[in-house]
Each structure stands twice: as C-alpha cells, then as structure tokens.
Regions:
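A structural signal for well-ordered alpha-helical segments within the folded catalytic domains
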Residues: 102, 213, 217, 240, ...
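A contiguous active-site-proximal alpha/beta segment in oxidoreductase catalytic domains
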Residues: 225, 233-312
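Glycine-rich, aromatic-lined ligand/substrate-binding cores of catalytic
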Residues: 97, 306-480
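Structural recognition of the beta-strand scaffold that forms the well-ordered cores
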Residues: 91-95, 116-121, 186, 204-205, ...
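N-terminal glycine-/serine-/threonine-rich beta1-alpha1-beta2 phosphate-ribose binding loop
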Residues: 18, 23-25, 29, 33-224, ...
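Short, solvent-exposed loop/turn elements at domain surfaces
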Residues: 101-104, 126-129, 196, 291-293, ...
C-alpha cells in the first residue's frame, strides 16, 4: 500500500497526527425496525451509527460559531412525548447506498432525531451487488418498508441512489400515513449534493474505502458534520488530513464503527487486576476475507453497466479500464481501493485495545503473506503482485514500552490462519474457534471472542478461582 502520495483533493491540507473524539456510538445494524431481531445469517458485525445520535442542537453547538446562525425554539412539550420539531432534527445526507448502507438505513430512519433529506451514489439502480445471504438485502428492504412484494420476481441484489430514494420516501410516507412522500433528493456526484443541499446538517459516508477521505474533507469544508464508515481513509496521509480538518473546524464527527461494550471490558479488567501477570502478546484472528483476493489484474474489458458512473467511482484514483472485479465488495481486496481484512474488521476488535492500553504507532511491522502459484511455459512459479492483498496473512506489530506498560507484540491473522492452540486449551481437548482474541502474559492467558467478548482465563479452573476471588457471577452460556 502506498503512503507516499497525497491525491489532488488533499494537496492543500497539512497532514498532522492528532487525536479525535468519537461523538457517535453504535450498537445496532441491519434493515430492522426498532423492535425487530436480526434475520437468520444476517451480518451483525457492523454496528449502526444511530443507537445514540446527537441532536441537531448538540451538533450545532459543537460547531462553534456556526451555532450562532440558528435560533432553535424547543417544541418537545408542544408536540408531545417523542416529538422532535423539524428545527431540531439532524438533516442527513447519505453518500453511498450499496448493501452496507442499506443494512444500516433502518436504524437511521427509525430515529426521531434524524431526517434523511438526500442520497447519493454513482450507481443509479444496480442489480449486481454482492451480499452475505441469498436475498438478504431484498428481503430486508421488504421488511423495513412493509411491502412483502417489493421487486417480486427479482433475485438480484439491489443498490444505488434510486433504491435509496425509494426506501427513504416509502418509509417516511408510511410513517406519516400518506400515500406518498417527496422529500429526498437524489444525486450521482457527492460534490453536487454538497453544493445544492444547503440545509444538510450531517453527511454519512458509506462508499468504497478509497473515496472516504475525499468525501469527508469536502463535507467538512462545507461545515457539515461527518459520519464515515471504517476505515477513515485508505492512506495514512489522507486520514491525517481528515482528522486535522475536523479538529480545525471544531466539527462533530464519527470516524470509527463503534465503541466497545461492557462485555468487551472484561479481558482488560482481568489484565489490570494482574490475572495473567505482565501482558506480553495479543493475538487476534479473523475468518475474513469473505470476498475474492485476485492474484492478477483483469485483462478483459467488459462494458460499463448502464447507470453506473465509473469515473465517479474511481474518484481520486488513477484512471483504469472498468471491471466488475474492482467494485461491489471486491474493492476490499485491492491496495488501491481497499484495506484488506484488517481494515474491514480490525477496527472492531483492535480499537478498544489501542484505546485502553494506550497503544500508539508500532515501532515495527512485519507481514507473512500466503502466495499463489501458476504454470507458465511448463514452469511452476509464484505469481508476484503489488496490487492486491493475499488470501491469508499474519501481521506482527511490535510496540515500544510506554509508561508502566512494557513492550508487547500484537499479532493479526486472517484467511483461516490462527495462532497455535495454547497448551491450556489442548489439555482440555479443545480447539481455537474460527475467530477470537487471546492475551498472553507471564503468568497466564485470556481467551475471548473476536472482539475479546466473553473473555475467560484458561484453563477453566483458573477462571473459576478468579471469579470466586472477585465475587463475579457465573457467565451465561455463549451462543455459537
């Protein structure tokens, strides 16, 4: 991945390393109404940004001088319980309306503090998106807008700006008891949206990784608050530029997918209580990737689908011929457009670890990737590429001592690779699960789920003794 260049959209920004505050917290996803449960096989890894969302008043106040431009008259009492007057709603523009945006739109539409007023996507009305379960997206839309026959006869995966506009307006019409609702603008180019939609309070960016920074910076320049899906950017310098812009303008932002819950705190509490002695290693492994990792660049040149703007999709990236292997979930596997498995899932599992242990940049990083072989002119040889992520890899990050914390190593594994099963687990005739996290100290080990949830000392006898010593209740059985 290249870290040495700044695309034209960022040339006037001075990158700097600076902290930022997470103003939005999320715990809910999918196309669900507030009281619905997740459908079977639904991907619940990505939290919605709407379980706790700032009011318009809070957003304006965090914007500093911008708050003085508005006179807000509270009318909650006049409107009754749950009523939020239009003057206090967050007016939201959704940039990017593919499968992940569709999964999250239910929680946004259900929030009384938010009014979706515009959608934007380079795809008009696509049917070639990818999903994690057959008809999951289509059936989720049907459930959300309460139309069981929506797009009857189509097994394609829908997405795009027209789909987004239809979802938003149908949902609002039914919530108001109306036959129709017309209040959601529709754009192909985010720049046009930002120029024309003067009343937008916040922008939610849910596009391929390589366009996150360009869209976020453009919105921040307009004084708009930004929610951007992980990762913040696809280049270190781009991420620093976004952070610096948000800090300089004192604008409320959300640059991470979620904060950890109490269940994820247990491992860190045990570490702080000395349950495993001095922490030396952290191991985190993921079943990702769930998309193809192509070892070769495509050579054929299929036509660009009708209604899909390839130039806008490329954004700040260099021009190249269109190919479906670059787009619609596939983008995660390419250096130019995505960040691989660790950028897809590492934010969820590692952010709390970095935050609570005070980890900064590692002093060194080494990666051991898998490779692909081919036969060329009767010769077996490895395929060399510098454009796509491997099917599997191990990454080792070494962190220098900081304060009272000694040096430690953090290991990331993906593509089916796991660390060796610890002796404590093998003695109980158990194996490591498909995903998980393990903390290794001088005097013991803690094993948990992918985000360190349901953390337990191993072996079980050690956990029982710890639970007794700290008056902790017996845990509920884990769902598998």
């Amino acid at each position: 991945m290249r870290f040495d260049r700044l695309p034209p959209a960022f040339e006037d920004q001075a990158p700097d390393v600076c902290a930022f505050r997470d103003h939005f917290h999320g715990t809910r996803s999918l196309l669900m109404k507030p009281n619905d449960s997740a459908p079977e096989n639904a991907d619940t890894n990505s939290p919605s940004p709407c379980s706790r969302i700032l009011s318009r008043r809070e957003l304006l106040l965090t914007g500093g001088a911008a708050a003085t431009a508005f006179t807000i008259v509270p009318r909650h009492v006049l409107g009754g319980v749950g009523f939020v007057p239009p003057s206090e709603k967050i007016t939201l523009a959704c940039v990017g309306f593919g499968t992940q945006a569709i999964r999250e739109i239910g929680g946004i539409l259900a929030s009384p503090d938010v009014q979706v007023v515009a959608v934007c996507d380079v795809e008009k009305d696509g049917t070639h998106y990818l999903e994690w379960g057959k008809n999951q997206i289509r059936d989720g839309i049907r459930q959300l807008i309460d139309e069981p026959g929506w797009r009857e006869g189509s097994d394609h995966v829908p997405g795009g700006r027209d789909v987004g506009k239809e979802i938003v307006e149908t949902y609002y019409a039914k919530q108001r008891g109306q036959d129709q609702y017309k209040g959601c603008a529709c754009y192909a180019d985010f720049r046009e949206l930002l120029d024309k939609e003067k009343d937008v309070t916040a922008v939610k960016v849910m596009t391929p990784d390589h366009t996150h920074a360009a869209i976020s910076i453009a919105a921040l320049k307009k004084g708009m608050n930004v929610i951007v899906h992980k990762p913040l950017a696809n280049r270190v310098m781009e991420a620093r530029s976004v952070i610096e812009m948000a800090r300089a303008n004192k604008i409320a932002t959300h640059f991470l997918p979620a904060s950890e819950g109490a269940n994820q705190k247990q491992a860190l509490e045990m570490i702080k209580n000395g349950a495993i002695g001095t922490l030396r290693e952290i191991h985190n492994w993921s079943m990702r990737p769930m998309w193809p990792q192509f070892p070769n660049l495509p050579t054929d040149k299929p036509p660009i689908p009708a209604g899909f703007d390839w130039t806008l999709w490329l954004g700040p990236s260099l021009d190249r011929p269109y190919h479906p292997d670059y787009t619609h979930t596939h983008f995660r596997g390419w250096y130019e457009f995505g960040g691989g498995s660790i950028a897809d899932m590492g934010h969820y599992s590692l952010w709390p670890i970095f935050q609570d242990l005070g980890l900064d940049s590692p002093v060194s990083v080494e990666s051991t990737p898998s490779h692909v072989c081919t036969v060329s002119d009767t010769i077996c040889q490895r395929i060399k590429n510098d454009f796509s992520f491997p099917a599997a890899c191990t990454i080792r990050m070494r962190f220098a001592p900081r304060g009272e914390r000694p040096a430690l190593d953090l290991y990331w594994y993906d593509g089916g690779i796991k660390p060796p099963a610890p002796d404590e687990l093998m003695a109980e005739n158990k194996e490591l699960e498909e995903e998980g996290m393990m903390f290794v100290g001088d005097n013991g080990k803690i094993l948990g789920g992918f985000r360190s949830e349901d953390a337990q000392l191993i072996p079980e006898t050690k956990m029982r003794a710890y639970r007794t010593a700290h008056n902790l209740p017996e845990p509920a059985p884990r769902e598998r």
